[in-house]
């Protein structure tokens, strides 16, 4: 029973932490989402003042092994990683100094508060609509022209079956990278599913290993 109570309180703390940080950052978020050219400043805020405090505040210690450093060098990259936890978003921010734009499912735009800013800065895709997928290509090219990187989880979502370690990849990320002639930077999140799965009564604090 104490273990289940811990998991319940720990999950509640996650949502409190995410929401509290957004509320505290509201003035900056409203300001920096007002103009597209301010995205780099917004990215710094999200990386250092939102994602990093969430990771450490939840008791996670990211350990990154780098074969390739994604530096803030005004070059564009296609960042791809396995998708297995809500923590993947925070981990991706933590791993990349280079500002990127997420390509993500439109359903997240319906979330209170978070969804408002998500709509303003991310490239939204309706996975059931071929027209929406075409629009993703054009929007991604615009952001690459702005010298920003693109981040896509090529599995297209988190598999419902938790026994699946890596689901089949959609080809969108690779098509965009080839067409725009930008390097693909693969990342592997080893521990996110174990540390913070989508199931409520599971997970643990500890190291989160990442290969870049």
Positions of PLM-derived features:
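Catalytic core of membrane glycerolipid acyltransferases/transacylases, capturing the structured
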Residues: 22, 26-45, 55-57, 72-130
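Short glycine-rich anion-binding loops that position phosphate/pyrophosphate groups of nucleotides
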Residues: 83-85, 155-159
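A cross-family acyltransferase "interaction/gating" segment
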Residues: 113-116, 148-151, 160-212
């Amino acid at each position: 029973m104490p273990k289940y109570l811990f998991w319940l309180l720990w999950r509640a703390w996650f949502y409190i932490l995410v929401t509290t940080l957004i509320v505290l950052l509201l003035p900056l978020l409203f300001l920096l989402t007002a103009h597209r050219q301010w995205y780099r400043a917004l990215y710094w805020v999200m990386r250092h003042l939102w994602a990093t405090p969430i990771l450490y505040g939840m008791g996670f210690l990211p350990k990154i092994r780098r074969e390739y450093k994604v530096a803030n060098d005004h070059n564009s990259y296609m960042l791809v990683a396995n998708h297995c936890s809500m923590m993947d978003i925070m981990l991706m921010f933590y791993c990349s100094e280079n500002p990127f734009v997420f390509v993500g499912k439109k359903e997240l735009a319906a979330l209170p508060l978070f969804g408002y800013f998500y709509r303003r800065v991310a490239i939204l895709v309706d996975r059931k609509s071929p027209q929406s997928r075409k629009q993703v290509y054009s929007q991604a090219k615009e952001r690459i022209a702005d010298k920003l990187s693109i981040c896509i989880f090529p599995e297209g979502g988190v598999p419902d079956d938790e026994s699946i370690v890596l689901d089949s990849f959609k080809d969108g990320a690779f098509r965009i990278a080839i067409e725009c002639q930008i390097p693909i930077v693969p990342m592997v999140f080893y521990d996110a599913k174990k540390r913070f799965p989508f199931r409520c009564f599971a997970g643990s604090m500890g190291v989160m290993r990442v290969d870049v």
